[in-house]
Structure formats: structure tokens, C-alpha cells
Amino acid sequence: VAFLALAGYALDRAFLETAESNLRTRLESYALEYTRRIEFLRDGSLYVPDTPPEPRFERPGSGLYAEVILPNGHWDSPSAQGPELPMGAMLAPAVQRFEGPLRITRSNGEAGEIYRYGRGLVWAENGPQAEFPYTVYISEDTSALSQQILVFRRALWGYLGGAGLV
């Protein structure tokens, strides 16, 4: 029985680490897609195309949020309208950060949590004298990840409990 408990714990940790790693990879790919799509106009203002990499970025409170931090302001995806999200800090160029769970207040006033991936970048299209830093953050509500973990844990402990009875 002790072996089954240890095996169950190890499988649970491995699943959790894999699920978080997959989430990080997905958030990173959205950040890279936004980085590829956004542009800065001659006056330095940010231009974000109307079509996001994922439709959920357009729906307020969808659970998937994009934010671009600039030296003189920031931009949020339409999905960020409603929930109170923690403000991201400007990251140094080439710095990546994956953090969470971070507390938020959802659009309906309930407490929630997000995971957030950020990447620090530099815009230098007009030469080194005109370059400036910016940071792209992508955040996702923990609800989907929590549900996956719950389903896995129920199945895991159900099967291991059954094996222990045998």
C-alpha cells in the first residue's frame, strides 16, 4: 500500500509539472505570435492588428489575456476588459518570466487566479538610437488547468485505491 501511495504521489507531481510546462509553452507561443504581429508607428505608438492569434483574446473575461507594457503606457487585449489583473512590470530585453498562480478578481467579482508568461523585447527597427524596450505578457485563468488536474487526480487515486484493495 505504501508503494502505491508513493507511486501515486510521484505520478501526481509528474502530471502537475507536465501540465504547467504545457501551459507555459502555450502562453509563450501566444506571446511570440503577438510579438510577430505588432508594430510601432513612426510616432512610437503601438499598432496591434484586429485579428488576434486566438479568438478568446477578443472576448471580455474569456480567461485568456494579452498585455503589452511600453515605457510610456500599456495596451490590453479586449479580453482584459472586466477582470482586475495584476499589472506586469517591464522586463529587461531577452528576459522571460513564467509565474503563477497570481490572484485576480474576475468580471463577476469572484476571486480567481492566473498563470502569466512575460517576455522582454526591444524595438529597434529605426536603428539603435531609436530603440526602446517593451514587454509582452500573456495570462490564462487557472480554471482549465485546475479542472484537468482534478479529473486526473480522481482517476489516479480511484485506480490506485482499487489496486490497493485487490
Question: Where is each model-derived feature located?
Answer:
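Juxtamembrane segments flanking the first transmembrane helix
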Residues: 1-72, 147-150
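Alpha-helical transmembrane segments of integral membrane proteins
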Residues: 3-8, 12, 156-166
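Surface-exposed loop/turn and secondary-structure junction residues enriched for glycine/proline
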Residues: 7, 41, 49-51, 60, ...
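General N-terminal targeting signals
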Residues: 32, 44, 51, 63, ...
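Short, surface-exposed, polar/charged, turn-prone segments marking secondary-structure boundaries
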Residues: 32, 55, 93-97, 106-107, ...
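Short linear functional motifs in flexible/disordered or boundary regions
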Residues: 39, 43-46, 78, 128, ...
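Extracytoplasmic
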Residues: 74, 79-157
